[in-house]
Amino acid sequence: MDSFTPPLLSDSLQMAMEVENEKSNPPCFSCIFDNQNGGRSFSGESYLASGSLKRVLLRLDPSPNDYEEDAIEMFGFQWVTETALVESCGLLFGLLRQQIYKLEDLIEMNSSDFGKAANLHSEAENIRRLCINFLHYVKVFIFRYLEPPKTENDGVLHPYEELEAQFPSLLVEELHSLTLHIGHLCELPSNVLAAFTIQHQAKIFPPSWHLLHLHLDIHWLVLEILHVLSEKMMRQVVYANHFINLTGENLTNISLFETHCENLISDLISLSIQKYTKVRPSEALTSHHYPCNCIKELWILLIQLLGFRNKGSQTECFWSLVNKKLKSIFERPTSSESVSVFGTTQCKDPLSFSLWIVTHLASLYQFDRNGNLEEKKQKESNWKFVEELLKNSIGAQTGVLEEHLRMHLQCCLTLCRFWDWNLSVITILWDYYSKNLNSCFTVPWLGLKGLASISKTSLSMLELVKSCCCEQQIPTLYKSSNSYLIFLSILARMMKEEAESSGVHPWKQIKGRIYSKFHRKRMQELTEVGLQNFFNLFLLLAIVAETEDIVSRVLDLLDFLTPSLVSPSQRALIWRGHFAFLLIYVEKNMDISVLAEKLSNAFRVKAKEFLVTKNDYTQKQNLWTLISTYIDGVQEVFETSCYLSLSEEKLLNDGFTMLLPACRGAELSMVLNFLQVVIARLRSVHKRVSQGLQPGNADSNAQLPLVAKEHHLAVASALWRNFFPYLKSQRMSQTPPSPQLADTAAGFALLALDIPSKALSDLQPQPVLSMMQLFGWDDMVWPHLVSRYLSHLIQNSALCEAFSTMGYTSYEALTVRSWFRCVLQMFIDQPSGTLAKTDAERTVGKAYMEQLTEMTRLIFKLKEVESILSKARVEEPVLKQDPKNALVQFIKAVGRTYSGLQTLPEKSAMVLKALEYLGDVLKYVKPYLKAKGPPEGLQLAYWIIGCLVKFWAPILATSKAQQLLFRIIDCLLLPHSVLQQDKELPGALLSAIQESLHLYLQGLSFICCQSQARGAYLNQLLGSIVQQYFGRFLPPSPTALGAGQHPMLTALCSSITVPQALRLRKTTLHVINEHYMQFKGSAPPPRLASVLAFILEVLQRTQASELCDVELVLPAVLKCMVLVNELQVKKISTVIVQYMVQGCQARSGGEHATQLTSVFRQFIQDYTAVYDHRVFSILETVAVLDQTLVTSLIPTLTQSLKDSEYKQGLGRNAAQREAYKRLLTHLSEAGQNEIQKLENEAG
């Protein structure tokens, strides 16, 4: 079947179709909700949700599917459906009253027993259902069976027709009696009214709950019945004739409807008063005015019914009735009648209550006839009454407190959502607030939240005003905003909505009223709070109305202020206000040049005052308050501006050139942070505009990028001109610069990369290169600045590409050189003394170490460095080491890489690159040497350069690098102060040398082996170093030798190449022999035992005896054994001889044995004549170790013996010969033979 679009149906036809097949219980008030409610505001049985009200208003059958049988059961009796009410109207209403009595009696029987309570609930529910069914039947009967009045009398009437004609009058009387019987809602007993508080989720209700809701049903159904009767009677007036005849009072269906409406509204207001007594002002809008959802529905029913009838001029409108009743609350009860209207409930604050209930009632207009929520503007407003309430609220006689005033205005703000704008309300409120601008509008019991606050920044000032323009309801508005700000919210909402709805801006209607309140005297009376409120007002107006006109007027008004009478805090507030207007300009994409120039000129004046003010601390503080306000404001403008195309450069004038030199500490930090933000913002926006990435609308003005770029050039020019000269002057300051200086310099470097044309002329033609040379590669700049500066730039791909494009290949090498210097100079700012560091110094040191660690991580990612590390096979964990160890690892990697090269060109290039990495390395450590500290700095310098000498020995051995080696030795190891033997070296310096000397010795010994051209000179240098430091590190006694190991011992015993070790050993032993083992006559040299202990330690650790040992050391040791009687010397000497003899044995035959024999032969010849017994004793000891050696010396010994006897001229020396024979007895057969010879000669 083809689909079709049904024609539009009228409301009445649609209702008829909906109920065609439905049959349900008659509607009633119900606050019982189930899970199947479908999210509706009211129960499905309610008059709204069931459609009952809608059917009545549309003149449809109230219950089309009910009461269709010929007979109907009511109150337990059968009645004829079509005639029952006409024939038995009084009886039926009497039965209704009986049922009400019966339900009232059940209340007395209420029980806490669950079984009894369930029975009572069931019985009460049945009674209520009987009553409701009857009243619905009355309504249906009138609609279906009551004939409209006939205009002409056709003669004699049937008795039923007579009864039918009298029925409307009788019905009015019965309804009147019924209303009198049930009385006022508020007059119900307290135990019945307490049923409002029963939870709606309950399943079993007490009789009181049923009775209370039955009263609500009766009150409403009486109105429905009267309305249906009026419609059926074709709006003719129905008089209650019998009542009139009895009482003389007039009673009609119209009067009864109006009276009952008034009474019902009075009752509902009375219930709301009871509810309001428990409501705090801060919770007014979140606290409902109805104790039960059924009361809410009843209010909506009244609004809909009275609104419908008012259209036909049948009844007063809803607001008229409500206003009348609310006005009566303001009158003190003077009679019993006035008391009865609202029962015993007295309203302590009728003004607040009236605004509160009007606001909540206005919100109920959003519900339609079906109880569905429709958020739309209402044509029917109650502004006139609200105006009267507001006049009372802010009247001088009333003196309403701020805590109530906030609630009153919050109600008005809520009403703005429902009703069209009202100029009178604005006028009334503005008249009040214009007189009280200096008020703080605080609520004492709110504490700090209730205090008036002055906005600290222009952005917070603007955000505060913007919050007043927010259309969303803010639950915490009472606590977060004072009444003045709520007034501004009302003003903003009314102006915006009127402009949107009518197209005519209401600003033209109210501008005169606002401007007229400000004149010279009034402006001069404003306090700081008053100025804040002044700016809040005009900022809001600038947002929602004509911005330029308003700002121009504000500037004129501020000119009324006398400058000398404006306090510093007021001046700062005025500047913040100006910047808030600038932010509005920026958000509206309006050029700011006029206002920016006015502000920047004022800033220039204050910056100059700040520069020249020296000793007046208070004046300086006041000026800084203004200056910091300006800086914050400019920063907010730059951060807010989307394209920086609105003349923002006007804010960066030459006032900053005067300000920067005068700033100290936190002040300078603030300015530099601000500068970083501005540079970063400019670069970001410039990049986006250059790439054509325009946010927002794709149909942007095509000229925008071109205009924006012109402004970007102007901003960049202002930055270079007014900020950079100061930065440049601070890079070589006497004290370490702040980290922000490095950050800002890095920002300028990147700015030079993005917009090179506007850099200063002395940086051209390659400003990026110039910036690197100034802040990154200059050896005179503080290492703290360099490390942080380069850390920002090392990994910048655009920067690397720029250097590559300009063909500058030394970029990475120079960066590595700077890293070398930063690591070497990490302690340069510490005092040279050994005093404990303060917490501040520790913090600075820690921060610099963290910065160096980050720089090291980035350096190791440079392509050149990665290549070197890769070739040297350095493991990844090296990258995570501290800077000192990482630098040592890099030095080792360079050395290993060089050693792995094969061709001469490669090696030559590597030497040049290594020297480029170093730069003038001695210049980096000179500050430590000059200050002779700090100890950490000296140790670091000597250690790192020692590593260079050792691990770069092959490089330093080349002709290109040898000059650096000589400078290192002259500067670090053999300076003039070392050569002065009578002058004691500083302890810190000596300690640093002792810790690292072995590195220099090992490296230098390698170079001595490699260098051909200058080998002799290098050997001489090596000898000089050993000569100068051997004695300095030699302990006074052998027992102290192991306590602090001698650096030369470390050098000699480390794992180095054989030629290198031999060269160092030979040189060291030569120096020891020449300078530390020479006797002065028979007097032994000083610290002889320590010298011998050193030699012994070398022999023991190397586990070998070299030829040089025999040549240089053995003669001296043998001499010590002969000439020195000290037990320790003899003992150590004996062990040395033992080691040497055994060492030569290990190298059997050859040069070592020959040299050993030669030394002993000479020893015999030199000392036998005088020290024969000692010589023979020594040789006895040697014979035990090497009998062959001593046997080979027999001829020499015998000849020496004879020579000695000859010289003495006394013949044979028996004692000598006996000593000699004892020696010979240790030499087996050869010795026995020699003894025999000697005896034969004697015979």
Curated annotation (Swiss-Prot):
Subcellular location(s) per record: Nucleus; Chromosome
Key word Membrane present: no
Keywords carried by this UniProt record: Chromatin regulator, Chromosome, DNA damage, DNA repair, DNA-binding, Nucleus
Pfam families: MMS22L_C, MMS22L_N
Main location: nucleus
InterPro entries per UniProt: MMS22-like, MMS22L_C, MMS22L_N
GO CC annotation, single: site of DNA damage
UniProt record, GO biological process: chromatin organization; double-strand break repair via homologous recombination; replication fork processing
GO MF annotation terms: single-stranded DNA binding
Record's subunit section: Component of the MMS22L-TONSL complex.
Functional description taken from the UniProt entry: Component of the MMS22L-TONSL complex, a complex that promotes homologous recombination-mediated repair of double-strand breaks (DSBs) at stalled or collapsed replication forks. The MMS22L-TONSL complex is required to maintain genome integrity during DNA replication. It mediates the assembly of RAD51 filaments on single-stranded DNA (ssDNA): the MMS22L-TONSL complex is recruited to DSBs following histone replacement by histone chaperones and eviction of the replication protein A complex (RPA/RP-A) from DSBs.
Family assignment from sequence similarity: Belongs to the MMS22 family. MMS22L subfamily.
This protein's name: Protein MMS22-like
Species of origin: Gallus gallus (Chicken)
